[in-house]
């Protein structure tokens, strides 16, 4: 099993949790981004640099991931594609995206996008809280325990 990270928008504190977990459990961790990333020197961690452009990292992840791989992303359309490919998608806040909740999340995203197009200010996500960081770490540990 591999953990893929949509790394451009992933918070540093979440990447740090992922680095420690990958090293501790000997789990492959692949960061995909369109900018250079720094990460610990480990045989289990690597970075893929994709061209700058719309959804380049997303396309790389979905074309290289395998069923049952874990993808860390806040990108709802990417999460939906991961689910279609039989992978597991988790947000940096520890929320698991599933076949049962992804349609609702896509609908909400589309509504917010329509509001933004009409000039409404919908705001972005709030800063990651300590509780959400813990929630992510716990969800990751559960996945690792199940899949190692």
From Swiss-Prot:
The record's annotation in InterPro entries points to: UPF0178 (IPR003791)
Which Pfam family, any one, appears in the UniProt record? Answer: DUF188
| Entry's family note | Belongs to the UPF0178 family.
Q: What is this protein called?
A: UPF0178 protein lpl0088
């Amino acid at each position: 099993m591999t953990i893929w990270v949509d790394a451009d928008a992933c918070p540093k504190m979440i990447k740090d949790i992922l680095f420690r977990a990958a090293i501790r459990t000997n789990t492959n961790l692949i960061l995909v981004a369109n900018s250079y990333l720094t990460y610990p020197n480990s045989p289990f961690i690597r970075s893929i640099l994709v061209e700058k452009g719309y959804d380049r990292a997303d396309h790389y992840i979905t074309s290289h991931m395998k069923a049952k791989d874990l993808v860390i992303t806040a990108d709802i359309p990417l999460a939906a594609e991961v689910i279609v490919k039989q992978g597991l998608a988790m947000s940096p806040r520890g929320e698991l995206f599933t076949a049962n909740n992804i349609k609702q999340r896509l609908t909400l995203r589309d509504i917010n996008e329509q509001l933004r197009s009409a000039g409404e200010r919908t705001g972005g996500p709030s800063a990651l809280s300590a509780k959400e960081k813990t929630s992510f770490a716990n969800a990751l540990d559960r996945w690792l325990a199940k899949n190692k």
